Design a protein with these regions (language model features):
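Glycine-rich phosphate/dinucleotide-binding loop and adjoining beta-alpha-beta core of small-molecule
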Residues: 1-89, 160-181
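Short glycine- and Lys/Arg-enriched binding-loop motifs that mark or flank ligand-binding interfaces
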Residues: 7, 68, 86-89, 93-97, ...
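Gly/Ser/Thr-rich beta-alpha loop segments that engage phosphate groups in nucleotides
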Residues: 13, 74, 92, 99-103, ...
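Short, small-residue alpha-helix embedded
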Residues: 40, 96-127
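Short beta-alpha connecting loops at secondary-structure transitions
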Residues: 41-42, 88-94, 104, 108, ...
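Short, charged, surface-exposed loops that flank catalytic or proteolytic processing sites
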Residues: 44-52, 114-122, 140-144
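Feature representing long, continuous alpha-helical segments
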Residues: 55-58, 85, 104-105, 118, ...
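Charged C-terminal helix
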Residues: 130-181
Length: 181
């Protein structure tokens, strides 16, 4: 079977000219727009996206049978069944160039390892934000770049897989993500 496809940035911008392409795809799709890209996809302003992020993301994911990660402060994930969850990890220091590229690569990496799109997406979004939170705690709230986030991943993955994540992170409400809507 074919692997799911992850589409970001200019791929999303290209789709905005012909959304019917999404209906012809027979493999699972994961789209990772930021609010501006999402606005182009649905033909509204970024401000309108921000006012009704959850409903717009859920409707789009359901209408086009895709998984959608609407990036931003409190990134959210919507699935083809019309469910959504909000990720609470991450911080404002992550609003810099290349962070979305890292996230897209993480999602694709988890899919390539055999995770289904929902788990791959939830895990990647969570770890992406967690790495940003660890960097903010160690270095301060701003001034890190995408490369710093990538450098943090091996240590975080090892800690998570071995159950050695610090207790303060394991018990923090921000690090539990379930379908909420």
């Amino acid at each position: 079977s074919a692997l799911p496809m992850v589409i970001d940035a200019d791929g999303i911008n290209a789709l905005s000219f012909d959304l019917d392409l999404l209906k012809r795809v027979t493999i699972p799709l994961v789209l990772t727009p930021h609010p501006g890209e999402m606005a182009r996809l649905v033909g509204v302003t970024s401000k309108e996206i921000q006012k009704d992020r959850i409903a717009i993301a859920k409707k789009f994911a359901q209408q086009y049978s895709c998984y959608l990660v609407l990036k931003g402060a409190r990134s959210l994930i919507a699935d083809p069944e019309g469910r959504a969850c909000i990720n609470l990890s991450g911080n404002a220091g992550m609003a810099s160039g290349g962070m979305g590229d890292v996230l897209t690569g993480m999602i694709a990496g988890f899919i390539a390892q055999g995770y289904d799109p929902v788990l791959a997406t939830k895990r990647a979004v969570f770890l992406h934000g967690l790495a940003g939170d660890v960097l903010a705690a160690e270095r301060g709230p701003v001034g890190f770049i995408a490369e710093d986030l990538i450098s943090e991943m091996p240590r975080l993955l090892k800690a998570l897989l071995s159950g050695q994540l610090p207790h303060s992170l394991r018990s923090d409400y921000r690090y539990h993500m379930e379908w909420i809507l």
